Amino acid sequence: MEGINISYFMNGAAFMFFGYVSFRLLTHRPRSRIQRILGLTLAFWALLELKDILLYFPSLKTERLVNSLLFIDGWAVAACSFYLLELTAPGWLNWKKVFSLLSPYLAFTIAYLCTFYAPIFPFYFGFILIYSAIIVLIVTFAARRYQRYIRNNYSYSEHIDVAWLKKATFILAVCLVTWVYTSINITGWGDTIYYISSVLLWSCLLYTSPSPRDKRQ
């Protein structure tokens, strides 16, 4: 398959990126609430990248297992939304809301695991696209409130704006569309674009994430 070697390399690079950054965030002191959420989110993405690496072994790559893991891959969209919602509305996220947002993903996954009914996939992908669009709208409208929060709580706020949101939204769209496409039509180049876009997405979010060192005393 064309581009497969490059996709293998980018898979490993993405795993190292998510693993290293999540470790640094979760072991850093002092650590803010948003950094803890970001660290846990990136740790989950690291596990997803590790899962892809393990699937390179033919003995593990069965059709039912691959399809089942595709449903779990979709959970990454929910994980990303947790961070974005918390970033634009600090203190909003709690375990009850996490379960509420994740419950549709769990329902689709359980439905497939109980039936192995392949036609569930189009409905799942459709739900993910709708969910992503709604999250983008919510985060967009919350951006001004986020800006006010930054100005009130962080120093050097004149250098912080919500321009990152446009970049992150565009990269998220590329990442999501590529993931859906490669889930249906597996290609080496498609996987490569997905891994690169996922690293770019989180690099953008990491760069704009507030740091406790910036917080006013």
Locations of the language-model features?
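Generic recognition of cysteine residues
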Residues: 80, 114, 175, 204-207
